[in-house]
Amino acid sequence: MTNIRKTHPLMKIINNSFIDLPTPSNISSWWNFGSLLGICLIIQILTGLFLAMHYTSDTLTAFSSVTHICRDVNYGWLIRYLHANGASMFFICLFLHVGRGLYYGSYLFLETWNIGVLLLFAVMATAFMGYVLPWGQMSFWGATVITNLLSAIPYIGSDLVQWIWGGFSVDKATLTRFFAFHFILPFIVAALAGVHLLFLHETGSNNPSGLSSDADKIPFHPYYTIKDILGALMLILILMMLVLFSPDLLGDPDNYTPANPLNTPPHIKPEWYFLFAYAILRSIPNKLGGVLALVLSILVLAFMPLLHTSKQRSMMFRPLSQCLFWILVADLIILTWIGGQPVEHPFIIIGQLASILYFMLILILMPLVSLFENNLMKW
């Protein structure tokens, strides 16, 4: 009798992706984040669905509907904080996943990498629109400031902004369309993640050494299923600790004040996971220049395969490149800190220096050091 797992059209896809998939025997815990991102996405879609059942996307009732969810709906507070902090966990996993890709040269899988960059943009767009929905002060002013950046586009800018707003300011039309997009985008993200996986399974996984692992593959199940379950339990533990002990740790207190177009908060800032990009945006005194730098801060990832000058794929055996990589990580942490600070001395100059260093490291220093390491190998 033939095994249904290997013959049934649907089961066959699952089998070849999660059960009999030949996997390198030496992939470390850094390879856990793909599955963790999948779990995060499922958590976000499920909690979001239940929140949408009680939420109203109207400027007059949005804020009070969120309050109603927290106070009157059974376990509404849990669903709301799982969704809010789930987004933070999502981005932590995303940053670590991208960092792993940069460190081990996974970006040389071109299709997988490019869809990954597209996924990053899609998730960032989803998170931004989700932050607008509670209609607190930071929701309203964050939406106003970020959408206004599009007015820097020459000629069509101001028309484009009004088209997105659906009027002359962020209002009911804006909130309604943001809710609609926030609902549909995660499903697009899920579809893209499927394509991401499809392309990955065309080539097989990379591994820490960056060398071919064809000679030493093991089945995904049970070895990596059990490893992924351990990762998932750790993720859920951290998420539940956040949700149950300090649910507002990563939020902004200003968002507990209903949106008021007549009163601007002293410091407008996005959620913590956008602060590094926000710091880069603010470090350039010109509006259009700032917007370009903001987009490039993420889009620069798409150029990584072109900037790869080393003869080795991974950084595992390249100590100089490792040094620069960890300087880049430290630089991103500094940018995140600066993004949350007021625009005054010394934060302005620190932000500008950190922004310059960010682009210099990726575009100039790392490719040059890789070439230098190639020459060192000849000795």
Swiss-Prot record:
Superkingdom: Eukaryota
Transmembrane segments: 33-53, 77-98, 113-133, 178-198, 226-246, 288-308, 320-340, 347-367
Keywords: Electron transport, Heme, Iron, Membrane, Metal-binding, Mitochondrion, Mitochondrion inner membrane, Respiratory chain, Transmembrane, Transmembrane helix, Transport, Ubiquinone
Sites where the protein binds a ubiquinone: 201
One BP term from GO: mitochondrial electron transport, ubiquinol to cytochrome c
Record has Mitochondrion as a keyword: yes
Binding residue positions for heme b b566: 97, 196
Details of cofactor binding: Binds 2 heme b groups non-covalently.
Record GO terms (molecular function): metal ion binding; ubiquinol-cytochrome-c reductase activity
Recorded GO CC terms: mitochondrial inner membrane; respiratory chain complex III
Membrane-topology annotation of the record: Multi-pass membrane protein
Reported cofactor(s): heme b
Protein family according to the UniProt entry: Belongs to the cytochrome b family.
Record function comment: Component of the ubiquinol-cytochrome c reductase complex (complex III or cytochrome b-c1 complex) that is part of the mitochondrial respiratory chain. The b-c1 complex mediates electron transfer from ubiquinol to cytochrome c. Contributes to the generation of a proton gradient across the mitochondrial membrane that is then used for ATP synthesis.
Further details from the record: Heme 1 (or BL or b562) is low-potential and absorbs at about 562 nm, and heme 2 (or BH or b566) is high-potential and absorbs at about 566 nm.
The protein's assembly and partners: The cytochrome bc1 complex contains 11 subunits: 3 respiratory subunits (MT-CYB, CYC1 and UQCRFS1), 2 core proteins (UQCRC1 and UQCRC2) and 6 low-molecular weight proteins (UQCRH/QCR6, UQCRB/QCR7, UQCRQ/QCR8, UQCR10/QCR9, UQCR11/QCR10 and a cleavage product of UQCRFS1). This cytochrome bc1 complex then forms a dimer.
Name under which the protein is recorded: Cytochrome b
UniProt source species: Anourosorex yamashinai
